[in-house]
Amino acid sequence: MGIPWVEKYRPKAFSEIVNQEEAKTLLASWICARFRAPKEFCARWAKKREKEVAEAKAVLLAGPPGIGKTTVVHALAREIRYELIELNASDIRTGERIKLVVGRGLKESSLFGYEGKLVLFDEVDGLHVKEDEGGLEAIVEIVETAKVPIVMTANNPYDPKFRPLRDISLVVNLKRLSEEEVVEVLRRICTAEGAKCEEEALRSIAKSSLGDLRAAINDLQMYLSGGRKTLTVDDIKRVGERNPQLSMFEVLDRVYRARWFDEARAVSFNPSFDWEQYFLWALETVPVVYKDVETAAAAYDRLSKADMFLGRIKRMQEWELLPYALELALGGVSQVKNKPRLPPFIKYGFPQRLLLLAKSREARRRREALVEYLAQNLHISRSLARSDIIYVLSALARRDPKVVERLSRALGINAIDVKNLL
């Protein structure tokens, strides 16, 4: 297959990176404000003069996978002629190991022709504070003391555990590419490869990639593998597209109709899969699909065990248990003993719990407003106001209607609504 096209066509310069002008400007402005960089580069790209840009000790590039976070850093290092020291934080996890690798890289002399060194910590959100002893603390320490530019990348840096990194970094958000921008890149690659690609075929690849340029390029290379020089819509239909977004009805249908355990488990790999929503739907659809009492009981037994895992995950933040919960909730529910032959069409009902929550949303919002008012004015916690004070007010309101009127004026809602809340 040769060199991966993701690497072959990786942008070599800032100007070749599409749709990330704001991110490029912020990154260049930070480099030029704190470190030595070519004058022509700074004159072209460094347009931001804000205090927080110059004072940040590092840059944290944020955004979904495949939009060019790592590519931006590679292009920056090439533009300013810095040697790039790249580490994948999810591979080198312990603090001791991180310090050793970075320290060794910084102590070694730069190769001939480089003006300095730039450190890239890729995928810092791959660190798990509980498991990766000292990894996050080591990165923070390096950022605080390093005399060289440090850039980090993360898909989601807004997890509370990354607060220490965010506090000392300039967070730069990269945008997801539009379908048209992905198509333009794919079109250029087809031309460079001497391949004749139908426009609709490229649009189909771009649409299914959901703005992930890396995924789109990998898909294009897969479709044109084996020396093929043409690509049509029929080719894509024949081979199959990237996993589409699935509705919950489609998720349930795939799980219940799965012939093997792994086939049901694979549903969780779909980008649209929401395990919390799935669990609510599964609880109500099991008796619809499995009419036999013993079969339904077996499915509910797997769901109850999965619920035990989920409860522990939420209480203890032990997310490493999630795969086991999903195996029980998906494969376990699908592969029950005496599984019946399913009809061509199954009518899955919307979970009543979600319907009730939707219907009561406004009432719950008003009740929370009442709780907030009581907590602030009585100088008590919201939980105490919710569990005790509301019931006291309810008893008082039954004896004295003026209590309802006073609360109505304070909250700005009519007296009937206040009475209903109590």
Curated annotation (Swiss-Prot):
Keywords: ATP-binding, DNA replication, Nucleotide-binding. It comes from the Archaea. GO terms for molecular function: ATP binding; ATP hydrolysis activity; DNA clamp loader activity. ATP binds at G63, P64, P65, G66, I67, G68, K69, T70. SMART domains: AAA. It holds the Pfam family RCF1-5-like_lid. CDD domains: AAA (cd00009), HLD_clamp_RFC (cd18140). GO terms for biological process: DNA replication. The keyword Acyltransferase does not apply. Gene3D superfamilies: 1.10.8.60, P-loop containing nucleotide triphosphate hydrolases. PANTHER family: CHROMOSOME TRANSMISSION FIDELITY FACTOR 18, REPLICATION FACTOR C SUBUNIT 1. Belongs to the activator 1 small subunits family. RfcL subfamily. Heteromultimer composed of small subunits (RfcS) and large subunits (RfcL). Part of the RFC clamp loader complex which loads the PCNA sliding clamp onto DNA. NCBIfam families: PRK04195.1-5 (NF003229). This is Replication factor C large subunit.
